[in-house]
């Protein structure tokens, strides 16, 4: 099975090379996305088989490629199988979407060669079983995604977004190189099998955890390493944005889980506190920034930050429970985090596909220039509404279940022995609740301003529904949002081998009909029946519709409800995206955004319009990145003098560096 998965990867790489040779645009689009769809579906089926029917011993494969003394090692276990399901499901949906969306692509020659290579790179990361193969695949993933971000580099701001992403990706890779270097130095080998058998010291483990959090967190979008997401995601084509947000960030989560739960060994309790607190801050900061956005794709990018924070809350709780030898609670927290990995991959891809359909139909990402699209694009509007409900954690959709499971894990915090965790975990729960409420408010704004009301521009009035392939991909993901929310037990059962392997336990047996009800700990505490809730919601909706039909007047008359003296008010008088975010901006603006509002009022009696100017700044960008950039520029100016030294001075520098290196090696030994 592992060899077959690598065969799918090889097929994707062949398609990547073949895209360069195909000159006809339409043929190339159909062929490349068709091959990518075929390979992704095959990889999805193989990964599902490995996850649902796990082998007694994980499959391994060693190939004589890469470093001569190491080769390339690959491994397929329950953890990699689950993430392969996520990666190939997202790849299949993006490939199907690309069959239609790709026909409108402005620069297919800069997208088609790198799209299948990007899919192949993510698959390789998930099956790599040695440090060199992992890092090579990780960097391959970074470079192919960077090339896709730079596909439209001539547009304003896209080149800067691409270079910032490359900088953050390089920082993350450097951190992972150091992490694997420490693990390899301790174990004496680079393959993961040898690293697993060596138990690092507490200090070494803490250093590896910090480096893994920095390396994987920069790719996932953990605050304060999130700054590239709101720039790179809008710059990339929409189906690539869906892959980067829905899949690539999950590959980063996989890297963190693989290192901290599998390779490092037994955790310490404060590791969980650090990771969970980082997740809570990430969730709140992400959703606050999303609320301020008017750009639809930037808004979705910030919500990726929020949901990555939710995932890291679950991972942090799992580490804390594992350190305190509470395997059942650790399994619950880990299951919640991994289920949210799957859920976010599904509904975030759906939302980016919807944003791409709007962008294709109107050429606009600014919500202030949209509106009324539900009349022109009813199917896209309905599917975007499903994704909005799912990401807002509304039942009966999948986002509710994984966040509910996370809250159930938080409610177990009184059993933790450390007094700091007894206070910290409920505070993190409050941050999670705040982020969930703000997410719902944000998507009321996103859906309402984009699809409801009246069109605010001519392009919105003339928009047309998107193509069938794009709609097919969106309908598939929308159906998964509903199925995973109504029947979550099927998906939770599939995660049992992963939780068992990493925590030594899995969720307890559920009460009654296990395909109907999930019970995280005990029925007396809490349980959830998605199917029953769905039936009740459907019955209530049908009852309300019947009552309206029975008692409403049969006479239909279309007229303005009340024009308040204005015969035909402009669409500009509607509620705007800025109007929705103003209350939140005034509460958090000074601290989080350094917000400034300026009002230009015309003179008394003048007929000019008043103008409101709002300036928002990212505090983390101004506090961390701007000073760092200035320091680097200053250091570069001073080091510029090194270019003009004599040969004697250069030899002196080389000799000094050699002496310093030998001294470090002597101290290390």
Give the ranges of each region predicted by the language model.
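Transmembrane helix-loop-helix hairpins at membrane boundaries of multipass inner-membrane proteins
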Residues: 1-7, 14-113, 186-199, 497, ...
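Hydrophobic core segments of alpha-helical transmembrane domains in multi-pass membrane transport
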Residues: 15-16, 42-44, 90, 180, ...
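Hydrophobic alpha-helical membrane-insertion segments
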Residues: 35-51, 172-178, 384-396, 473-496
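Membrane-interface helix-loop-helix modules in multi-pass inner-membrane proteins
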Residues: 58-84, 131-149, 216, 401
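Membrane-interfacial helical/loop segments at transmembrane boundaries in membrane proteins
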Residues: 59-68, 191-197, 405-418, 491-523
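Hydrophobic alpha-helical transmembrane segments
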Residues: 73-87, 202-216, 420-436, 513-541
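Hydrophobic transmembrane alpha-helices and their helix-loop junctions in integral membrane proteins
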Residues: 93-110, 115-134, 144-465
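Aromatic-capped, Gly/Pro-kinked transmembrane alpha-helices
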Residues: 491-539, 546-669
